[in-house]
């Protein structure tokens, strides 16, 4: 499920530090991956995200808001 809630750049260092307590996080200059079980979230610098583990838009948006912010 692709989500694009933010329309501003994402600071991977700041988001990564905030996500560490919630599950494994990896990132480079192009992508941040986060695994809040049972989901997998891939975040891009422009704010887009791909959330695996659900086909429900409401769940995907809720996960995005919870972990990335709106």
What name fits each language-model region?
Residues 1-23:
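Short Lys/Arg-enriched alpha/beta "domain-start" segment
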Residues 1-5, 30-35, 51:
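Generic recognition of long tandem-repeat/solenoid scaffolds
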Residues 37-70:
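Generic C-terminus detector
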Residues 20-34:
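Intrinsic, low-complexity N-terminal interaction/targeting segments
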């Amino acid at each position: 499920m692709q989500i694009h809630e933010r329309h501003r750049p994402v600071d991977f260092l700041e988001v990564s530090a905030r996500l560490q307590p919630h599950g494994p996080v990896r990132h480079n200059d192009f992508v941040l991956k986060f695994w809040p079980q049972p989901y997998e979230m891939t975040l891009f610098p422009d704010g887009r995200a791909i959330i695996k583990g659900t086909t429900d838009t409401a769940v995907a948006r809720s996960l995005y808001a919870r972990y990335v912010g709106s």
